[in-house]
Amino acid sequence: MATIQIIIEEDNVTINVKKNQVPPIEVSPKIPPIEIENVKKNVLCPICLIAKVNTVLECTHVLCSNCVKKINVCPICRKTFQSINFFRL
């Protein structure tokens, strides 16, 4: 029976198996916290990819108000909607 030793360091995980050695596994770097300013600047409408999102549909998908005015079905999940919620970032 093989013995497994797991060594966890800050950003590396190494697994050693007695008799056989497994190469180190790279762990993804820690994801930095999301800053609200970055969200405001980078949230573009997934339909037109031009305008910032400012509308939430009943299905919780978000679009820009220009795209929402042209549709009555969510282009992402295909659910029909009756109400639209506008918001300001």
Swiss-Prot record:
Pfam families: zf-C3HC4_3 (PF13920). The keyword ATP-binding does not apply. It comes from the Viruses. GO terms for molecular function: zinc ion binding. A zinc finger (RING-type) spans 45-78. Keywords: Metal-binding, Zinc, Zinc-finger. This is Putative RING finger protein 121R. It comes from Invertebrate iridescent virus 6 (IIV-6). The lineage of its organism: Viruses, Varidnaviria, Bamfordvirae, Nucleocytoviricota, Megaviricetes.
